[in-house]
Amino acid sequence: VELMDGVRLNLITYLSSRHHPESWVKGGYLQLDKLPFLGNPDWFAKYMTLRVGHMEINYGDAHFRRTDNGNAMYNPFVGNYIMDAFATEVGGDLTFQNNGFLVMGGMTGGEIQGGVTNPDNRKVSLIGKLGYDKQLSEDFRLRLTGSIYTTAGSQRNTLYGGDRAGSRYYMVMENTLASTSRNFTSGRINPGQTD
């Protein structure tokens, strides 16, 4: 939804999934491409994008084309990587783009599950991305990026275990007692980097 010129609100709801049969919110964020309420400075509108909210973190590029529940439009293979670096967290990021070069820096709470227990275990997570993305000809687009994600600690970080919708590898590598809802990440490998 475009709230005003250069200000957008994004909200994504899962209608159903392997993990939850009922509707539930994936996340939402406010995106600022212009600052009309601050006099709309040209430098911001030309080079910057700011996102703030509970959102899919901008780590790597695979999350732009991954299958997310029923949305498989950008993924010709339907299933995602076996190690799926995907998570939603509460935070923000700022992206600078100029002539194909991009620099992004972000900060999040480091986890999806908020709470007040064990405050000493909860630290801020920092995310960064450097890259080059340019349409070089009508048939050729070049994109090369590198990302970093770091945290000093969290109660339960979900960088490789953040897919709450479920994998498309139904029951692969599961035993005969498995169920599609209980084992909704079947066929995936989670390295267990939860802290």
Kindly label every feature range from the protein language model.
Residues 1-113, 120-127, 131-138, 143, ...:
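Outer membrane beta-barrel
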Residues 114-195:
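Surface-exposed beta-loop-beta
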